[in-house]
């Protein structure tokens, strides 16, 4: 599969004006409990799917917005979240991003996460390392959970599991130096990938939430698994446990209690 990743990143950067269009950010459709989509989401997805399909017509699409259909995972798939952090966007809380990953039929090989509010571009190609604004970055080297900053996520869509979710988060909070949450899983995962944080946990994420960031973290030297320590398949929802590698087993053991 021959993909010009530099040109793909340029397409993602072109989404800046679409995301910063405040008028479209307030054209809101309610999909479910605390689950929103704005005209920005539709505009970004329409632009990227159109541009990528023109250049790579044989690559399939999995996107947050739009019709879901059966995919052939033995073939390449773009995995797109046009706006990760839609609720943030609606509230003008400036932690939202475009997240684009590529599955080559066997594994995730490319990830790009772009936050236009802070002009931060994370990108990684398998075997080539991870870059933040074209500067190579790696995960931290903190050796213990007690000295680590942990990113956590909570879903507003299923508050019936709040006690179960927050029990796990409480364990991490007590055992670590502290916890943080931005409201965007992709941004939180990239915060780990560039060494600003040391671990990440969220109970239930969809493929477009995490696909790009898995490449960004692993190419930066980190580890990403489910709660059982197993590899992630990007065709399904999953709990995500990610770390700098040093504290991974400690996190898994704590979450399993």
Residues covered by each model-derived region:
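N-terminal subdomain of lithium-sensitive/metallo-dependent phosphomonoesterases centered on the IMPase/IPPase/PAP
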Residues: 1-83, 246, 253-256
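Residue-level signal for inorganic ion chemistry
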Residues: 15, 19, 41, 52, ...
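Short secondary-structure boundary/capping segments
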Residues: 28-29, 53, 68-71, 113, ...
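Acidic active-site catalytic centers that drive phospho-/nucleotidyl reactions
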Residues: 41, 64, 81-84, 88, ...
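DPxDG-like acidic metal-binding loop motif
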Residues: 72-131
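An extended, acidic
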Residues: 138-257
